A protein has these predicted regions:
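Domain-length accessory/inserted modules outside core catalytic folds
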Residues: 1-123
Length: 123
């Protein structure tokens, strides 16, 4: 099993245990075909490849922000996303390192708190 982290568009998170052949699990987690984006040697973002084409799929603020930091504001990441570690020499996914797991969960928690406070303000 390889640890991964799903971050939903509402900033909630879920730790996933991916099997060795994790393609179907990744597709299920993002709701369709997957696209891998390497953000760092040990951090890969998985998103829905057709996210912008699916009616009703919301932007993922965290995914978009991390994409922008690496590649500039050239794309928007839509829908729920999954983070894994990089890949090994054979191209297989690696587990998400604990340091990334903690940082990403903290970021999602802070944004969820801010989002909920704003929602109450405008309610």
């Amino acid at each position: 099993m390889k640890t991964a982290l799903r971050i939903n568009t509402d900033f909630t998170t879920e730790i996933l245990d991916l099997e060795a052949d994790s393609l179907m699990q990744l597709q299920e987690a993002v709701g369709g075909l997957v696209q891998a984006v390497d953000l760092h040697d040990d951090l890969t973002l998985w998103c829905n490849e057709e996210g912008k084409l699916i009616n009703g799929m919301l932007a993922n603020v965290i995914g978009t922000h991390l994409y922008e930091k690496n590649f500039g504001m050239t794309d928007i990441i839509m829908g729920d996303i999954v983070f894994t570690g990089g890949t090994d020499d054979e191209g297989d996914n690696l587990a998400l390192p604990t340091a990334w797991l903690v940082q990403l969960q903290e970021l999602a928690g802070k944004l969820r708190t801010a989002y909920e406070a704003e929602a109450k303000f405008f309610a």
